Amino acid sequence: MSNAGGTAGAARGTSRRTVGILCAIGASLAWGFGSTTSDYVLSAGVGNDTFLVIELSIGFLVLLALGAIRGELSGFRHPGLLRASSTGIIEPWGAYTLGNVGIIFSSGAFVALVSSLNPVLIAILAAPYLGERVSRRAAILMVVSIIGVALVVGGAGAAGTLKPEGIIFAILGLFCGAAYVLISSKLVRTMPVLPLVASQLLVAALASLALLIVRVTIFNGELQLPATEMQWAVSVATGVFGGAAPFILYLEATRRIPTTTVSQFSTLVPVIALIGGVVFLNDVTTPVQLLGTAIVVVSLSLLARYARAH
């Protein structure tokens, strides 16, 4: 009986880790696809703050509907949720806004490269904050995957002008992203994921709306709404893939496998964005980018295998 019980326990542990890995991969897929749709909408001339209001509001409404279907609305009365929802200022609002401003002063490739350092920052801070340590093998795979990302985002050649402001905003966005992951990973140990993420999206949407109102009323800016049905459809889709889905999946993953491991799968995001650009935006890849893609995929495959066993 003891052997049978031990075997069953090991199987449950493996299954739990497998689900965590799948959630981490799913979050990266959603963020990558969301990057592609965001690129399409913003390139069409939709205002950044306007787009964030639409995207984050849709994400909130989707999670609210999902919570109603799953009977989880009672979770919105969880003690401490109101205070915890303020982390939405850090991300999505802070990280997304700072990243977009960073792109204005530098380039999307540079901001993506800086963002790929997120697993490194989390690995450093997770030890004192979450009590997690990265194994030697996982650390090696993390470095290899980041090298792959560097090839993916830099393989098309340098683009844009790198200014000090771009560096500052990109780094601030990086710290916002890492802070959100560490704080939220700890929060979901004691509160339900769906109400937490929905509340964070709502706070971020309201912050974006406040900026939009200031820009339009005080600085006489234009609303810059989506101009066509396609732009509206893609904006709404981004609310699902860039707002609701990735945060839910990411935090669900941290409940099953170490946060330091989950963060490493985020290096898959630029790869998915690259593929999405080729498929939907007619972007052209280079051999260097394809090599980087292969490196990221192989390193993350090895990481998934290692995480499933440990």
Annotate each PLM feature.
Residues M1-I54, A159-K186, L206-L211:
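Glycine-/small-residue-enriched transmembrane alpha-helix faces in small-molecule transporters
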Residues R16-I21, A44-V53, F76-L81, G154-C176, ...:
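Juxtamembrane helix-entry segments on the extracytoplasmic side of multipass membrane proteins
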Residues S28, V53-I54, Y96, V111-P119, ...:
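Helix-helix packing/entry segments at the starts of transmembrane helices
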Residues A30, G34-S35, L64-S115, L151, ...:
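Specific transmembrane alpha-helical segments of multi-pass solute transporters/efflux pumps
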Residues G32, T36, G88-W93, T97, ...:
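Hydrophobic/small/kink-forming positions within alpha-helical transmembrane segments
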Residues V41, F51, E55, G102, ...:
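Hydrophobic/aromatic residues within transmembrane alpha-helices
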Residues T50-L61, I90-E91, G99-R133, A138-M142, ...:
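Specific alpha-helical transmembrane segments that line the substrate/conduction pathway
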Residues L63, L125, V134-A156, S208, ...:
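Hydrophobic transmembrane alpha-helices of multi-pass small-molecule transport proteins
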